[in-house]
Amino acid sequence: MIAVKPVFKRWAPEWLIRGTIFIVILPCLLLFGLSTANPNAAAGYYGIEPADVQYSMIIFYAAVASFFALERRFFVYLATKEYFLVGIILQIVTSYICYNTHNLHTLFIFRFIQGMANCGTTSICITLIFSRIQSERAREIGYSIFYGMLLCISPISMLLTAPIVDAYDYNFLYKAIIFCYLPGAILLLSIMNTVRLNRKIPLYQVDWASFVIYALVLCLIGYVLAYGQQYYWLQDKRIVRSCGAILVLLLLHILRQLNLKRPSQNMEVFKYRNYIVGVFLIFVLYIVRGALNITNLYFATVLGMDPIHIAYIMAANIVGIVISILISSRLLILKRPMRLIWIYGFGLLLIFHTWMIFLFNTQADASTFIIPLIVQGMGAGMLMTPVIVFAVSSVPERLGGTASAVGVFFRFLGFCSSIALINFYQLYNRTNHINRFQEHITSLNPVAVEKLEMYKRGLVGKGVSTGQAAKIAQGLLGRFIETQAQLRSAIDYYTVISGLLIVVILIIALIPYINRTIINLKSKQPAPISY
């Protein structure tokens, strides 16, 4: 009998294999978070708008989400080592181009290619990890750790990149990512054998048409949600045309999938009631999770913190995520009711948002926000794995790939919707508050007069002339109005999110059939793209 050649060389110990995979997957995940690391620095370096920075991140996400279904064909065609090498080379080359370019369209194109390569590399790493985990108990822990890492990416990106951006230009981050890839890639290639994890299937009848249509749909959805508020939504022809194209292409994509013999996305998943509940909760979770950016904006614009100090405070969020990973994985192993776990998670998020409504102020000590940020991390970590594994377990095993792909679509949609909502509250709601404040700033308003006099006295006391002090005082009053508008906008947004969380908790409590889904992960593994 012929011995099967192992994936890794026999001399490589298990701790080295797992450690190497972790070293490889970390820069893959960090690559997504580069755009969120310091949006102002990115906009300043490339000479673009903040919405362009957001869209560069959305394009990356759209690439990994759309390539997910097609990626499996390349995975089974190439040997694992060869496929990994192609993915790493593509990511290094595209990172180098992003490092050198100043052209926005070039950045968009290569961020998309980068996303496709990232999907392949992450897929290999996740497959290698879960191929070595056999028991269902270990897989549940593996799920929790993997999705916990994804939740930590944003604060970790801030923590790692803030000192670099402070010392170098923004584009240096892409050079740093290249050097992060090299050690793990070299080490993994040196301990791997040239083997296949699946039977080789030739690359014939690859459904490129579905990939192109689906990628266009995702990019257009991201475009509308990222730029919609800036262009006043349907008042702008670009948004109207994009919405029309989305409807046509989405209908074409659905009809195509319904008529294909082997569709990349089987619409049959929507026949399962609990799956619909699962993807709805994923969508809500990503909107709520994105609301943390309002807190980051508050730290930066109201409290005047620099990115380094914000990153240090956000480390508390990582602590909360780690704690909740341990708790949620334990609850999954013990087969606790899924409704109970969800209520715990959404309840913690509700506590965070209502707490922050009362903490938002023009002056605050950084230590005040540590416990709330831990609570937010615990809420997000408590939900991420249980919601996703519930959705995947709600459908038969043959639909597992489609369930993951459609789940990624709803994550993408929730992510983009969160950006759109925050843009609305930052551009429209905040402007309304500024206008309302300015209506009351007149010479007849005693509060405004008193505030101006206070600024003048303070400036004159520091040696500024009376005439100059009057001009500066007007500017300080304008800044005070903007700060108050930012606070009111943040409070309004968190009030809406709190209301949404209350509704979701009530829905979960009133749906009895949720607990009928049996969580079974023995034959499944997480989707490689779940940012």
Question: Over which residues does each language-model region extend?
Answer:
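MFS-fold secondary transporters
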Residues: T94-Y99, Q114, L188, W355-Q363, ...
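Helix-loop-helix hairpins in multi-pass membrane proteins, especially solute transporters
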Residues: L70-A209
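Hydrophobic transmembrane architecture of multi-pass small-molecule transporters
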Residues: F415-Y513, I519-Y531
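Interfacial helix-cap and linker-helix signal at transmembrane-aqueous boundaries
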Residues: A42-G47, F74-V76, I129, L160-D169, ...
